[in-house]
From Swiss-Prot:
It comes from Human parvovirus B19 (isolate AU) (HPV B19). Its cofactor is Mn(2+). It catalyses: ATP + H2O = ADP + phosphate + H(+). The endonuclease active site can probably bind other divalent cations. The lineage of its organism: Viruses, Monodnaviria, Shotokuvirae, Cossaviricota, Quintoviricetes. This is Initiator protein NS1. The keyword Transmembrane does not apply. Belongs to the parvoviruses initiator protein NS1 family. Residues 1-176 are annotated as: Endonuclease.
Length: 671
């Protein structure tokens, strides 16, 4: 039998209106195994017993009803509340409220001096359906309360008649065998979709389920297999199925529920790397034509080494090294590669710097976090370290409070140093060491060709599927001791499938501090693009550097132009310091008297420990020094690409780029 449940609130004002019939009632209450009833507690016990007596001899819809009434004191205010559990052949959701209110108010009418009425609040689900779990509610909630919390209780349900007002039984109810409600009516046919509300132990589901539930389960599995996690992707993959489901309100709700379950399954129950691998390995055999492979080779990285690390990193198997940092100047493929990886995972979130109060609003419940060109402020540095290190934490969300964020892989793309922490108008490096311990950094220094195009999910799947199928040992050798800087390419350990692909241009240097095979002359300083030489907010020249060879063009190849500027224009257009002041010995550089060259530090004098052949900082200092010396003694010889053939001197004098290139500022000051 279905038993409905609800609550009646009895305020203290109702008891103030009690008449003599209520106070002087001779109703016998058995309190032999119960706490003594005094004052208003006795009034409520009399009232509850009077309602039960009337219900036993009433007719209409309440005839033959089972009931369980329990009155309790309010915790935070004066007064009482009555738990009502009842059900019968004539009761249904339509007449339940009217019948219960009529029964209690008819009895109350003869016990008060004023016209006071009680209101019944039935228990309902969030969808507006009535709870029908009265049996479980009695066993798991009402009968587990003991006197002082419970004022009085009455019932006509077998098994509870003698025990409902037994303090001894209630105190041992959790160990005693619970009685069951036995009726001739089969109560297993409850309406679908209504909550049972049980508090008992969770029992694994062993049933076969209904046809609708099996169909819904099949739909969720289909979404995961076809990598459909958004409504737009669903429309593209199977528009007919989406249209049929959207035609009804219940179908639209199924779409949202199925997508949520598919996302949960993909982010928590299935390794993320499975979505980055191609199902057909035969389609990934021509790996040398892959755009990502060409990009990484151009940046002087081994595509196999990077790919194996990405597969391990995306599955959260790198420990504290939970973050990939793509660092370099614009147009080098950083964001292109990061977004291609992000679009290949089930669902990704982005750190939003437009809202400084809630930058991590989109991080919770994602497979990957993309951090594009951001800064770390002192107010969020601790949360940022937890997220970058893959540690569980809580972040604030707008209009939602704080939510838990488990370890999620993070990929960062930036032109500046992300390890600097900003606090007001100051910048500190106190947290730099802790942040670097959570990252693996890849330097992107070679600009990509304009016709490279966007990297796609197919490129990522082809690249990573090929990497997953290779058994190359040099990744494990590096993974034993993770370093902050990702190791550069090793020609001896390069996979045979990659040997025929160009590795790096003649004018580029190792992005990870690798060894150069040729001695660098002073004239070649102006053709270098070195790490740190591009840290500027001022835009670079739009004119590309002409190529040094006529070989086949690939991702990082420079392009030709009819208007050619000075060969060092792009390389030297950098703000390493104030470009109009003279360099200071001991501050900006150290002079190597043996070779007659500037170096970055005393340790690199006479090529000990580095020098021009190994240290990129020494190369930067040399290019800076020679460029300054060249501009000082040739003030008006070099011009930008727009004024190469200009005859009007005022056009050159007013051009900021010409002033930077040829030292015209010092020339004007002198004149």
């Amino acid at each position: 039998m279905e038993l409905f449940r609800g609550v009646l609130q009895v305020s203290s004002n109702v008891l103030d209106c009690a008449n003599d019939n209520w106070w002087c009632s001779l109703l016998d209450l058995d309190t032999s195994d119960w706490e003594p009833l005094t004052h208003t507690n006795r009034l409520m016990a009399i009232y509850l017993s009077s309602v039960a007596s009337k219900l036993d001899f009433t007719g209409g819809p309440l005839a033959g009803c089972l009931y369980f009434f329990q009155v309790e004191c309010n915790k935070f205010e004066e007064g009482y509340h009555i738990h009502v559990v009842t059900g019968g052949p004539g009761l249904n959701p339509r007449n339940l409220t009217v019948c219960v209110e009529g029964l209690f108010n008819n009895v109350l009418y003869h016990l008060v001096t004023e016209n006071v009425k009680l209101k019944f609040l039935p228990g309902m689900t969030t969808k507006g359906k009535y709870f029908r779990d009265g049996e479980q509610f009695i066993e798991n909630y009402l009968m587990k309360k003991i006197p002082l919390n419970v004022v009085w209780c009455v019932t006509n349900i077998d098994g509870y008649i003698d025990t409902c007002i037994s303090a001894t039984f209630r105190r041992g109810a959790c160990h005693a065998k619970k009685p069951r409600i036995t009726t001739a009516i089969n109560d297993t046919s409850s309406d679908a979709g209504e909550s049972s509300g049980t508090g008992a132990e969770v029992v694994p589901f062993n049933g076969k389920g209904t046809k609708a539930s099996i169909k819904f389960q099949t739909m969720v599995n289909w979404l995961c297999e076809n990598r459909v996690f958004t409504e737009d992707k669903w429309k593209l993959v199977d528009f007919n199925q989406y249209t049929l489901l959207s035609s009804s309100h219940s179908g639209s709700f199924q779409i949202q529920s199925a997508l949520k379950l598919a996302i949960y399954k993909a982010t928590n129950l299935v390794p993320t790397s499975t979505f980055l691998l191609h199902t057909d390995f035969e389609q990934v055999m021509c790996i040398k034509d892959n755009k990502i492979v060409k990009l990484l080779l151009c940046q002087n990285y081994d595509p196999l080494l990077v790919g194996q690390h990405v597969l391990k990193w995306i599955d959260k198997k790198c420990g504290k090294k939970n973050t990939l940092w793509f660092y370099g100047p614009p147009s080098t493929g950083k964001t292109n590669l990061a977004m291609a990886i992000a679009k290949s995972v089930p669902v990704y979130g982005m750190v939003n710097w437009n809202n400084e109060n809630f930058p991590f609003n989109d991080v919770a419940g994602k497979s990957l976090v993309v951090w594009d060109e951001g800064i770390i402020k002192s107010t969020i540095v601790e949360a940022a370290k937890a997220i970058l290190g893959g540690q569980p934490t809580r972040v604030d969300q707008k209009m939602r409070g704080s939510v838990a964020v488990p370890g999620v892989p993070v990929v960062i793309t930036s032109n500046g140093d992300i390890t600097f922490v900003v606090s007001g108008n100051t910048t500190t490096t106190v947290h730099a060491k802790a942040l670097k311990e959570r990252m693996v950094k890849l330097n992107f220094t070679v600009r990509c060709s304009p016709d490279m195009g966007l990297l796609t999910e197919a490129d990522v799947q082809q690249w990573l599927t090929w990497c997953n199928a290779q058994s190359w040992d040099h990744y494990e050798n590096w993974a034993i001791n993770y370093t902050f800087d990702f190791p550069g390419i090793n020609a001896d350990a390069l996979h045979p499938d990659l040997q025929t692909t160009p590795i790096v241009t003649d004018t580029s240097i190792s992005s990870s501090g690798g060894e150069s095979s040729e001695e660098l002359s002073e004239s070649s300083f102006f053709n270098l693009i070195t790490p740190g030489a591009w840290n500027t907010e001022t835009p670079r020249s739009s004119t590309p550097i002409p190529g040094t060879s006529s070989g086949e063009s690939f991702v990082g190849s420079p392009v030709s132009s009819e208007v050619v500027a000075a060969s060092w224009e792009e390389a030297f257009y950098t703000p390493l310091a104030d470009q109009f002041r003279e360099l200071l010995v001991g501050v900006d550089y150290v002079w190597d008297g043996v070779r007659g060259l500037p170096v970055c530090c005393v340790q690199h004098i006479n090529n000990s420990g580095g020098g021009l052949g190994l240290c990129p900082h020494c190369i930067n200092v040399g290019a800076w020094y020679n460029g300054w010396k060249f501009r000082e003694f040739t003030p008006d010889l070099v011009r930008c690409s727009c004024h190469v053939g200009a005859s009007n001197p005022f056009s050159v004098l007013t051009c900021k780029k010409c002033a930077y290139l040829s030292g015209l500022q010092s020339f004007v000051d002198y004149e």
